[in-house]
UniProtKB/Swiss-Prot annotation:
Positions of the UniProt region annotated as Interaction with RNA polymerase II: 312-419
Region span, 8 X 7 AA approximate tandem repeats of G-S-[QR]-T-P-X-[YQ], motif CTR1: 758-815
Keywords assigned by UniProt, alphabetized: Activator, Nucleus, Phosphoprotein, Repeat, Repressor, Transcription, Transcription regulation
Protein name per Swiss-Prot or TrEMBL: Transcription elongation factor SPT5
Subcellular localization: Nucleus
Gene Ontology BP annotations: central nervous system neuron development; hemopoiesis; negative regulation of fibroblast growth factor receptor signaling pathway; negative regulation of transcription elongation by RNA polymerase II; neuron migration; positive regulation of hematopoietic progenitor cell differentiation; positive regulation of hematopoietic stem cell differentiation; positive regulation of receptor signaling pathway via JAK-STAT
Keyword Repeat: yes
Protein's gene: supt5h
Principal location: nucleus
Superkingdom to which the source organism belongs: Eukaryota
Length: 1084
């Protein structure tokens, strides 16, 4: 201090001492004379006596705390969260001693304060009188800055701060350190107990453990803390403990500043919001569900909305709660029921009103009967509360703000937020509501965002419930939860609580909550969650119906069926359809159409549209059009309503139709009759009929670059350019699909040039109606007789009956197979020229390529050689089985000439299996058998030793070839008409006479067997389709098309005109004229 300050301080001290002495003298002299002085002394004396009495009570009850007694008026009992146990306040432990020291000096302290007040007021008056501003400011600085409030009130505040500091000493460098030791997860507590037992066991030995403590916090998994001075002490303690084997070689010391955090217990304050759910811990409403109405954080209370439990028996007895419980020995909790004011009044209870609430026994009830009551925060369970669906139904139909989808989840976890770094969010609660920003990091429920505001440049931290996702129009997002989970799309509209997005896959508008969206750049894969199905996949709905998946949802599919209707089905209700990439159909111009072809719709509801074929099923095609919004651009139409882009009408196929029915399969025409009946030339074609024409592999430059049309096979009707060609095959680049394929040259026709002709046409004058096979395209469904066209002349009778042997053994091979080495043809040709040897395997074709059947020379000697063919029993002419392969068997009734057993000779027909036609039926669809001339075939072999003998004019055909009479019921030999749900009649040919002529309904078809429900006997029997015939429908009957291109379609028969009927189809409501034989009557 300076000299002036020292002098001022000494003057002040002298003034204070003199003033104190004067005050004491005045009090002693004027103790009875001054009323004011006596009153003041009495008040001071009473204060001192009260404090002394209070201290005496404290000394008597030192063994129990007096915290609540002293501070009961300032602390709320309800706000004490940890009411299960009470701790002494550390401040009180240190402060009681200090207060005891100060109580003896209270009187002196009061005198000092009075002296200071008197001296200060006197000096203040002098300063005001002299008007010295500097001195006045210095006075106030000294008065209010010289001591703190605590020092002025308690005095000796230095001792108090020292004692408090002693209670909060932090660990230093001289204290033991904490070491983290890796432990087996889940065994932390048990490991700490085992170390404690080990410490006790070694305590009285020569080598006690040097560790001080072991800590296993609940929130730390996989580690424990060991307190010791050195790391070697820790290793010695954990040696031999199995759970600590993994941490024996590596222990890490905890920094000194972080040691206190290991034992710090921070009680998480539950942030309850209105409309959230809690359960009661105890009391009458224990475990009852309740909804938060409002929260009072200052009073630590919470108001709940719940279903009351009112004991009506007690109200009826007019007893108080205390008397009622005293009377009833066993407590019985009343059931939950909503408050009914009328019922309470009827039992004698008093109900009053307070605004919108009803008051009964000091409790508030709403108009709907719910109880609103306040509870302490410690009386409720706030974590993991999930109301069940039954509780929600009792509580309310759908409480406000509750997401039933979330509530019904079986998991006990709280619904976690789905916020991620990079999401755009906005604040929905608190002071910064509507503030937008971008998430920088996510740490549990703490979200750090960078606000998008010009005045806010620093990151801000928010709890997750105060944020919600924010999207702008044009954002590309992905649905991460809810009904449309996994779908992606573009946001087209943003509402207050939901977002409208346009799906990338299905092109539908989806309405989704913002919390279920996430910004993304990729597009949905279109595969369901299980990976079993994908968008646009062909699935089987039932045995007769297929469809295409047009929308994938979490639990269901939306399927566009073949009839154009969209159905919603569950995942388990559909089966994946076998891949039909190679399916073929015919368009309106008889062009072949395949999957991935570009076609145009010329008829039906989608007329004028263009699209790409995705699937073909029977006569239906599923197409995809990028310009169509509905169903993701998928639509279905009939194949005959399409026209192939770039295609042209192929050769006429009218001679293959019956009654206007065009075969849907492209394999109905014979592959060996290009251009209408000519035989193919020698080369690679022929399907291996005679084993000839393998080709040398030389390039044919003349054909390269020419535009050709494919005339046969699965690509029939396609036009393309030849890129490469050899003697047998050509590589053709198709115009429509831009793909290059290999095609047999025999199946190509140059556009603009003449079609290839055979050697000679052997077609008859008129197409034989009776000999057309297969009937109604049955051949195209089984490969055995698929490509047979009129094999031989069946309309002539008698069948070569009057001919006699025209040629002897010396004839030239003009009418026989010229390249057959087994025939004694003269002159003979060398084998190497035609690559045909005697040791070749016999071909299934009965003759050489392009030749006619070659009879044996009558004079040819019999040579004992193994017979190639098995015994062949030709069909009796009266046998009804002609073309139906299911009915063929070696017939028991031989022809009048007897069974055909040719003499052993090297000549053979090379038939592997007998043909039901009886004459050289080949299995190869490419082989060609022209109609034989009358002189080339000896039709009536007999057991004569000289080979063949002429047939008598009246003898039947040995091959059993019995052509149908034109106009006969041609569909009776086929079972293609069989389908489900139609009414049939059992024919007389069935063995069981009890069901003959009964009518029934076909329930299912398996192969050639039908399960028929007989209406008369009400039983189900299995009958072969050959013993059934369809019931002819009558007017106004509901019918089903059983034959033709509209097969399986249904409709109503409006009228009958002769053998035709007018039908209104159900699918497109069109009127069609169909033959009655093409219709089956549906079940009534």
């Amino acid at each position: 201090m300076s000299d002036s300050e020292d002098s001022d301080f000494s003057d002040n001290q002298s003034e204070r001492s003199s003033e104190a002495e004067e005050v004491e003298e005045n009090e002693e002299e004027e103790e009875q004379g001054s009323v004011a002085g006596s009153d003041k002394a009495e008040e001071e004396g009473e204060d001192l006596e009260d404090e002394e009495e209070y201290d005496e009570e404290e000394e008597e009850d030192d063994d129990r705390p007096r915290k609540k007694a002293r501070h009961g008026g300032f602390i709320l009992d309800e706000a004490d969260v940890d009411d299960e146990y009470e701790d002494e306040d550390p401040w009180e432990d240190g402060a009681e001693d200090i207060l005891e020291k100060e109580e003896a000096e209270v009187s002196n302290l009061d005198h000092v304060v009075l002296d200071e007040d008197h001296s200060g007021s006197r000096r203040l008056q002098n300063l005001w009188r002299d008007s010295r501003e500097e001195a006045l400011g210095e006075y106030y600085m000294r008065k209010y800055a010289k001591s703190s409030g605590g020092e002025h009130f308690y005095g000796g505040s230095e001792d108090l701060s020292d004692d408090i500091t002693q209670q909060q000493l932090l660990p230093g460098v001289k204290d033991p350190n904490l070491w983290t030791v890796k432990c087996k997860i889940g065994e932390e507590r048990a490991t700490a107990i085992s170390l404690m037992r080990k410490f006790v066991a070694y305590q009285c030995t020569d080598t006690p453990l040097q560790i001080k403590s072991v800590v296993a916090p609940e929130h730390v998994k996989g580690y424990i803390y060991v307190e010791a001075y050195k790391q070697t002490h820790v290793k010695a303690a954990i040696e031999g403990v199995g759970n600590l084997r993994m941490g024996f070689w590596n222990q890490q010391m905890v920094p000194i500043k972080e040691m206190t955090d290991v034992l710090k217990v921070v009680k998480e304050v539950t942030n309850l919001k209105p409309k959230s759910w809690v359960r009661l811990k105890r009391g009458l409403y224990k475990d009852d569900i309740a909804q938060v109405d409002y929260v009072e954080p200052s009073q630590n209370t919470i108001s709940l909305k719940m279903i009351p439990r009112i004991d009506l028996d007690r109200i009826k007895a007019r007893m108080s709660m205390k008397d009622w419980f005293a009377k009833r020995k066993k407590f019985k909790r009343p059931p939950q029921r909503l408050f009914d004011a009328e019922k309470i009044r009827s039992l004698g209870g008093e109900v009053s009103h307070d605004g919108d609430f009803m008051i009964f026994e000091a409790n508030r009830y709403s108009r709907k009967g719910f109880l609103f009551k306040s509870f302490a925060m410690s009386a409720v369970i706030t974590e993991g509360v999930k109301p069940t669906l039954s509780e929600l139904e009792k509580f309310e139909d759908q409480p406000e703000g509750i997401d039933l989808e979330v509530v019904t989840e079986t998991t006990g976890k709280e619904r976690e937020h789905n916020l991620q770094a990079g999401d755009n969010v906005e604040v929905c609660e608190g002071e910064l509501i509507n503030l937008q920003g971008k998430i920088l990091s996510v740490d549990g429920n703490k979200i750090t965002i960078m606000p998008k505001h010009e005045d806010l440049k620093d990151p801000l931290e928010f709890p997750a419930h105060e944020l919600r996702k924010y999207f702008r129009m044009g954002d590309h997002v992905k649905v991460i939860a809810g009904r449309y989970e996994g779908d992606t799309g573009l946001i087209v509209r943003v509402e207050e609580n939901f977002v409208i997005l346009f799906s990338d896959l299905t092109m539908h508008e989806l309405k989704v909550l913002p919390r279920d969206l996430q910004l993304c750049s990729e597009t949905a894969s279109g595969v369901d969650a299980g990976g079993q199905h994908e968008w646009g996949e062909l699935v089987q709905l039932d045995p007769q119906t297929v469809g295409v998946i047009v929308r994938l949802e979490r639990e269901t599919f939306q399927v566009l069926n073949m009839h154009g209707k969209v159905l919603t089905v569950r995942h388990q209700a559909v089966n994946r359809r076998k891949d039909n990439r190679f399916a073929v159909a015919l368009d309106s111009e008889q062009n072949n159409i395949h999957v991935k072809d570009i076609v145009k719709v010329i008829d039906g509801p989608h007329s004028g549209r263009e699209g790409e074929i995705r699937h073909i099923f029977r006569g239906f095609a599923f197409l995809h059009c990028k310009k169509l919004v509905e169903n993701g651009g998928m639509f279905v139409c009939k194949a005959r309503h399409l026209v192939l882009a770039g295609g042209s009408k192929p050769r006429d196929v009218t001679n293959f139709t019956v009654g206007g029915f065009a075969p849907m399969s492209p394999r109905i025409s014979s592959p060996m009759h290009p251009g209408g009946g000519g035989q193919p030339q020698r080369g690679g074609g022929g399907g291996g009929g005679g084993g000839m024409g393998r080709g040398r592999g030389r390039r044919d430059n003349d054909l390269i670059g020419q535009t050709v049309r494919i005339s046969q096979g699965p690509y029939k009707g396609y036009i393309g350019v030849v890129k490469d060609a050899t003697e047998s095959t050509a590589r053709v680049e198709l115009h429509s699909t831009c793909q290059t394929i290999s095609v047999d040259r025999q199946r190509l026709t140059t556009v603009g040039g003449k079609e290839r002709q055979g050697r000679s046409s052997t077609h008859l004058r008129t197409p034989m109606y009776g000999s057309q096979t297969p009937i109604y395209g049955t051949g195209s469904r089984t490969p055995m007789y698929g490509s047979q066209t009129p094999l031989h002349d069946g309309s002539r009778t008698p069948h070569y009956g009057s001919q006699t042997p025209l040629h002897d053994g010396s004839r030239t091979p003009g009418q026989s197979g010229a390249w057959d080495p087994n025939n004694p043809n003269t002159p003979s040709r060398p084998d190497d020229e035609y690559e045909f040897a005697y040791d070749d395997e016999p071909s299934p074709s009965p003759q050489g390529y392009g030749g006619t059947p070659n009879p044996q020379t009558p004079g040819y000697p019999e040579v004992p050689s193994p017979q190639v063919n098995p015994q062949y029993n030709p069909q009796t002419p009266g046998t009804p089985a002609m073309y139906n392969t299911d009915q063929y068997s070696p017939y028991a009734a031989p022809s009048p000439q007897g069974s055909y057993q040719p003499s052993p000779s090297p000549q053979s027909y090379h038939q592997v299996a007998p043909s039901p036609v009886g004459y050289q039926n080949t299995h190869s669809p490419a082989s060609y058998h022209p109609t034989p001339s009358p002189m080339a075939y000896q039709a009536s072999p007999s057991p004569s030793p000289v080979g063949y003998s002429p047939m008598t004019p009246g003898a039947p055909s040995p091959g059993g070839y019995n052509p149908h009479t034109p106009g006969s019921n041609i569909d009776q030999a086929s079972n293609d008409w069989v389908t489900t749900d139609i009414m049939v009649r059992v024919k007389d040919t069935f063995l069981d006479g009890g069901v003959i002529n009964q009518t029934g309904i076909i329930r299912s078809v398996t192969g050639g067997m039908c399960s028929v429900f007989l209406q008369d006997t009400e039983k189900v029997v299995s009958i072969s389709s050959e013993h059934l015939e369809p019931v002819t429908p009558t007017k106004n009957n509901k019918v089903k098309v059983i034959l033709g291109e509209d097969r399986e379609a249904t409709g109503v028969l409006l009228s009958i005109d002769g053998e035709d009927g007018i039908v209104r189809m159900e699918l497109d409501e069109q009127l069609k004229i169909l033959n009655l034989r093409f219709l089956g009557k549906l079940e009534v």
